[in-house]
């Protein structure tokens, strides 16, 4: 199984400080052979964490793929993505720079999403949860269960049916192994009070470690 992923710039929602409108971003993971969307979600920030979160949720639902294929965006080409794929036994590939045809399948899906964004604009969602709720309904009713022009001899097969008809066994892993694969690690120096600073907070390590450098291992989805 080969998965693609991409980030699409979404609408502005009043979710910033004091209701200021803030742009949100859609991350999707799509099965190459069937065009089935394994997971898609709008997020409030544009960073590597949103890709990792979406990837983890896709894996939890559908197991691990043999290969993932990404563009060269900085949210994908990170040491943590490399570590995750290595830990889970996933082959990690990147598209050649300046070759949009290599990510054409998911780019075509992103153009289909434009129809959803037009519909969502009429609903005027005020929260990220509401936007994601609308997206999931649209995904089920207007994409996953609709005939896809690239599937089947008569172009009458939907991504949902194509994926469910693929009898290749899904590979599920223990939840602890998945959690471990997505952990991050950063070095911090212990100050004179025996504390370290991390993610805007102070944590006591102990006087015995003053001047030492310690590794902070953490789950970015649980900060």
Where are these regions (language model features)?
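Mobile genetic element proteins and their domesticated derivatives, centered on retroelements
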Residues: 6, 35, 55, 68-71, ...
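Mobile-element integrase/transposase regions
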Residues: 1-28, 34-37, 48-57, 61-66, ...
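RNase H-like two-metal-ion nuclease catalytic core shared by retroviral integrases
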Residues: 68-72, 76-88, 92-117, 129-132, ...
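A conserved active-site cap/scaffold subdomain adjacent to cofactor or substrate pockets
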Residues: 124-155
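C-terminal, beta-rich DNA-binding module of retroviral/retroelements integrases
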Residues: 12, 143-223
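A generic secondary-structure signal for well-formed alpha-helical elements
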Residues: 33, 59-63, 89-92, 113, ...
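Short, solvent-exposed helix-loop connector elements
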Residues: 117-133, 200-207
């Amino acid at each position: 199984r080969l998965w693609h992923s991409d980030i699409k710039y979404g609408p502005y929602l009043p979710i910033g400080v004091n209701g200021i409108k803030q742009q949100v971003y859609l991350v999707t993971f799509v099965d190459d052979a069937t065009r089935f969307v394994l997971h898609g979600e709008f997020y409030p920030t544009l960073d590597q964490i949103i890709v990792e979160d979406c990837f983890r949720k896709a894996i939890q639902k559908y197991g691990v793929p043999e290969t993932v294929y990404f563009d060269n965006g900085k949210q994908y080409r990170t040491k943590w993505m490399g570590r995750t794929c290595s830990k889970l036994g996933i082959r990690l590939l990147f598209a050649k720079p300046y070759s949009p045809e290599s990510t054409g399948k998911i780019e075509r899906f992103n153009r289909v999403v434009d129809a959803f964004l037009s519909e969502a604009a009429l609903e005027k969602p005020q929260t990220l949860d509401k936007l994601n709720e609308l997206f999931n309904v649209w995904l089920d009713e207007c994409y996953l269960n609709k005939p896809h022009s690239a599937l089947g001899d008569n172009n009458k097969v939907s991504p949902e049916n194509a994926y469910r008809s693929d009898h290749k066994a899904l590979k599920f892993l223990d939840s602890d192994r998945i959690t471990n694969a997505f952990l991050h690690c950063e070095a911090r120096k212990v100050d004179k009070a025996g504390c370290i600073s991390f993610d805007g907070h102070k944590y006591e390590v102990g006087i015995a470690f003053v001047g030492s450098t310690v590794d902070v291992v953490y789950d970015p989805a649980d900060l």
